[in-house]
Amino acid sequence: RHGLVEIAVVPLIPDHPVCRGWKEWEIDDEYYLDPTIVDAKPLLRVTERGGKDVIVGWVFDRPGGGRSFATTLGHPYKNFKNESFRRMVVNGILWSAGIDVPMEGARVDVPADALALPPEQK
């Protein structure tokens, strides 16, 4: 997808540890056009304005051990101001590292000024 669009992020496996502590949320984002990640389970979906569903997040349990979480979301930095987005990312990191994700999701409290870009990077 080229350019920012308003989308609703929907968990396809709501009880997966990466999805703990958040429900559907809306953001403006730019994501890759429907890539296929072989053998991974689709985890996150967005619906385009025309009604087409696009998978934007996956999880993968490796046969020999290890885990992966991938998402095509997160293009604009401003999305890190969204608590649900931050929680999804941190939950994904914890789960991939084999660390138990709390039932309420990871703590992602951040002071607002810590999320501001320096003026020269805006």
Where are these regions (language model features)?
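An acidic, glycine-rich "communication" segment
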Residues: R1-G51, P63, G105-K122
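Extracellular ligand-binding/catalytic regions of CAZymes and related secreted enzymes
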Residues: R49-V54, R62-K122
